[in-house]
């Protein structure tokens, strides 16, 4: 498939044009025209690029790409080396951030919920697009049991605050990645618990004082599954040779 056709295909699937983001979504670095082999991963790090080069990939598809609004526009240093490697090897780089977080089927929230047996997802925020969501545990469980479930599923021990929550978790808020700022909204919406990737100092106070359990399961760990699902969809529906490469990150 043509590289621009692939961009259009993913844009349409993820409804990228309907979501305001702080990074460009779509084809970020243009490479060869024809695409057959795709490497997917969470972040367009040098390690992922090197792996794609070793596999003779035509494209890299990630959740965390480049050209964030807060970063310098200069192509130098670490960013310069990464982009040079892409250009020299004629590899396309596609990045999809918030559209991949919120997609109801392939998104990070939806995929994490599926893995943790959380059903009936609903938006936490009012408006057309909600980044955080809430759902119901298929089987209510204690905070301790849910922490053990997270560790087993994600292969990572979560940071937890389970001091003042209810006896059993039924309703749980979800926002993968750096979503700790939504904990107060989850409390307002009557959630028994909130799971995200990161934690801030004030997050623990919010959990303690508002009486809900909090689980920080890792930015990388909670966002592996959306990009993986997107790649699997491309392989199944369009016949691409797709490989998900997990470049481990404890953060």
UniProtKB/Swiss-Prot annotation:
Pfam families: DUF34_NIF3. Gene3D superfamilies: NIF3 (NGG1p interacting factor 3)-like (3.40.1390.30). Transmembrane segments: none annotated. InterPro entries: DUF34/NIF3, DUF34/NIF3_sf. It comes from the Bacteria. A divalent metal cation 2 binds at residues 64, 219, 223. A divalent metal cation 1 binds at residues 63, 101, 223. One of its GO terms (cellular component) is cytoplasm. GO terms for molecular function: metal ion binding. Keywords: Metal-binding. The keyword Metal-binding applies. Belongs to the GTP cyclohydrolase I type 2/NIF3 family. Toroid-shaped homohexamer. In the hexamer, 3 dimers assemble to form a ring-like structure surrounding a central hole. PANTHER family: GTP CYCLOHYDROLASE 1 TYPE 2 HOMOLOG, NGG1 INTERACTING FACTOR 3. This is GTP cyclohydrolase 1 type 2 homolog.
